[in-house]
């Protein structure tokens, strides 16, 4: 009897554990969300649960009220316009949830990145939607890293893999996230690509250039859910202002996506597997600008771009400073000696003093030696 009870208890715990991880974007299953009138709202590569929320591109909020798992369809109630991002409210939310190490107050801009689904790739660019090695998602990671670094941000990118792509992937990537958080970054990004088949849902134009939309995902089953949501809303609001059409939408799902680890943690999906990978890579430049603005302010981009120019100009600035000082010295010497001959001696003496005898004195000594010969 005791053995049976123990086996039953273990089986129940395993089932609950599996269910908890399955909440987080089950792969290879598409769910369709419709409103109460039957109009299509969105498609998700993963399960949708009652209570999940969705913020559309035009900031309309939907709350799921029922789900038919056999038909892979969810019905959502329109709730009107999602309240606009409120900076004061966000500050209060982050103040109560922030776990960032106060010791990291050195002014350094630092963002940490990783990819939970290490196989995600793009059929148009990688030749397959899933690759065990050299997955296309890491090309997107590297492109975003480079774009952020050009803005003056230090990026810690983990290339750890968390295969296979199953319900336990987030458990494996959690270890990576925890290691990255030891660095006390300003934000923690989990980079993905979507799995919906219609690439047109991600095709867009920004500033007249073709690029990919980006979907933001927030896990509502975690203590940081409010902070994660505000972070996502801030990203969308900033992107809508700077690059209208870049952010596809925000999905707030039942899982946690490891976001309980950090208030400024977000999952970003760059395009889908049927989209041209180059478009997903192009979107990283826009997202880097958005993230830099969100985390460090409007002037951060200009500062980042100006740093290289300042460094490049430093050498020429020093040269001109020396030249001006030298010219002033020559004018003064000429005025005080009255002759060009004496001026030469004056300059040689000054050069000897400035260079510790390497110039000027050495020439005079050589001339003296020749005279003695």
Label every PLM stretch briefly.
Residues 2-22, 319-336:
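Sec-dependent N-terminal signal peptides of Gram-positive bacterial secreted proteins and lipoproteins
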Residues 126-201:
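Catalytic-core regions of hydrolytic enzymes
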Residues 176-182, 186-266, 274:
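Membrane-proximal low-complexity regions enriched in glycine and acidic/polar residues
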Residues 44, 55-116, 121-124:
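Non-catalytic propeptide/linker segments at domain boundaries
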Residues 23-38:
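Short, basic/aromatic beta-hairpin or loop at an interaction surface
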């Amino acid at each position: 009897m005791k053995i049976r009870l123990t086996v039953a208890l273990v089986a129940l715990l395993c089932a609950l554990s599996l269910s908890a991880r399955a909440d987080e974007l089950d792969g290879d299953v598409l769910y369709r969300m419709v409103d109460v009138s039957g109009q299509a709202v969105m498609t998700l590569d993963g399960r949708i649960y009652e209570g999940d929320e969705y913020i559309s591109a035009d900031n309309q909020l939907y709350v799921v009220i029922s789900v038919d798992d056999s038909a892979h369809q969810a019905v959502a109630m329109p709730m009107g316009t999602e309240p606009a991002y409120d900076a004061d409210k966000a500050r209060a939310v982050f103040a109560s949830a922030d776990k960032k190490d106060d010791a990291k107050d050195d002014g350094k801009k630092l963002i940490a990145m990783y990819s939970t689904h290490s196989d995600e790739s793009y059929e148009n660019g990688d030749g397959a939607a899933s690759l065990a090695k050299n997955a296309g998602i890491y090309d997107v990671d590297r492109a975003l890293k480079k774009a952020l670094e050009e803005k003056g941000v230090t990026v810690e990118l983990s290339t750890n893999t968390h295969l296979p792509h199953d319900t336990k992937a987030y458990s494996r990537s959690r270890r990576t996230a925890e290691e990255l958080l030891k660095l006390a970054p300003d934000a923690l990004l989990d980079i993905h690509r979507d799995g919906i088949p219609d690439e047109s849902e991600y095709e867009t134009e920004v500033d007249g250039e073709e690029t990919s939309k980006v979907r933001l995902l927030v896990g509502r089953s975690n203590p940081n859910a409010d902070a994660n949501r505000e972070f996502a809303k801030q990203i969308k609001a900033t992107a809508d202002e700077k690059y209208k059409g870049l952010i596809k939408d925000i999905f707030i799902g039942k899982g946690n996506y490891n976001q309980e680890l950090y208030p400024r943690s977000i999952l970003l999906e760059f395009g889908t597997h049927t989209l041209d990978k180059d478009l997903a890579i192009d979107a990283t430049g826009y997202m880097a600008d958005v993230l830099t603005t969100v985390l460090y302010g409007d002037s951060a981009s200009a500062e980042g771009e100006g740093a290289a120019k300042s460094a490049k100009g430093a050498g020429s600035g020093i040269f001109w400073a020396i030249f001006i000082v030298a010219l002033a010295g020559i004018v003064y010497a000429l005025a005080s000696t009255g002759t060009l001959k004496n001026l030469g001696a004056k300059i040689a003496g000054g050069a000897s003093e400035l260079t510790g005898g390497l110039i000027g004195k050495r020439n005079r000594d050589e001339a003296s030696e020749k005279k003695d010969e």
